[in-house]
Amino acid sequence: MMENYKHTTVLLDEAVNGLNIRPDGIYIDGTFGRGGHSRLILSQLGEEGRLLAIDRDPQAIAVAKTIDDPRFSIIHGPFSALGEYVAERDLIGKIDGILLDLGVSSPQLDDAERGFSFMRDGPLDMRMDPTRGQSAAEWLQTAEEADIAWVLKTYGEEHFAKRIARAIVERNREQPMTRTKELAEVVAAATPVKDKFKHPATRTFQAVRIWVNSELEEIEQALKSSLNVLAPGGRLSIISFHSLEDRIVKRFMRENSRGPQVPAGLPMTEEQLKKLGGRQLRALGKLMPGEDEVAENPRARSSVLRIAERTNA
């Protein structure tokens, strides 16, 4: 059941300003959430402007459907498929900006029934779209110990990944876990050294959530597609919340902001260099939340906004 959650959109003005909105432009909000970014974009569009929003969370879709605006449309699906959505609408190369607000949203974290948080007991689910795929409980009950350890180490950067994975498998053999509180307790008991500033289950919950939702693969595919769908001068405005996300975004923007990499001393004609293509993006820098925003919304502390512009190449 969906409740009315107060949701403060992180880096709201900065992310939308990064799109450099044109009144008649066509924009994509790849992570609609509760619509903070979408509503601000719509307020800056003229009658000819268009906004295509995407979200895989059915609760977000329900909120989006309350927006009665002919310039706005919502798609229920993963943002990794934005290339397909754009192609279906014959808009390849015509998109003036894409905004992505990565990771889990505050309403998802705060709703115990979604199973994202170790702070609230609820079903051990963690799916951004509960209608598709395996829940966290289902995966943890069927996965091999080595696979669980790999996920915890890779996506949670968990120092005690092997110990925690062993404890999870042993607990599931005795009695399958179905609640977030059960997983949090198992992880805490298996963690020999506690961080006084961080709950011992923090990294495990992050890792399992990322795995269950294929979050990093989603980001990589969306970024790859963005090069095809953006018009020259179109902007990418992307907010990430942890180092794994930001690393992918930073690397993508850096690699595509370079010209062709040719070994030193390799003789090439101007025609050959032209065929290699020029840089496809121009990185415009990064922004982080100010002290006032962090004080008002502590979850903003780790956020990073990166902006880039599509070139004519």
Swiss-Prot record:
Entry-linked Gene3D superfamilies: Putative methyltransferase TM0872, insert domain, Vaccinia Virus protein VP39
Reaction catalyzed: cytidine(1402) in 16S rRNA + S-adenosyl-L-methionine = N(4)-methylcytidine(1402) in 16S rRNA + S-adenosyl-L-homocysteine + H(+)
InterPro entries, sorted: RsmH (IPR002903), SAM-dep_MeTrfase_MraW_recog (IPR023397), SAM-dependent_MTases_sf (IPR029063)
Localization: Cytoplasm
Keyword line: Cytoplasm, Methyltransferase, rRNA processing, S-adenosyl-L-methionine, Transferase
Database matches in SUPFAM superfamilies: Putative methyltransferase TM0872, insert domain, S-adenosyl-L-methionine-dependent methyltransferases
EC number: 2.1.1.199
Coiled coil: none
GO cellular component: cytoplasm
Gene Ontology biological-process annotations: rRNA base methylation
GO molecular function list: rRNA (cytosine-N4-)-methyltransferase activity
UniProt cross-references to Pfam families, sorted A to Z: Methyltransf_5 (PF01795)
Binding positions (S-adenosyl-L-methionine): G35, G36, H37, D55, F79, D101, Q108
Entry function: Specifically methylates the N4 position of cytidine in position 1402 (C1402) of 16S rRNA.
Family: Belongs to the methyltransferase superfamily. RsmH family.
Designated name of the protein: Ribosomal RNA small subunit methyltransferase H
Gene assigned in the entry: rsmH
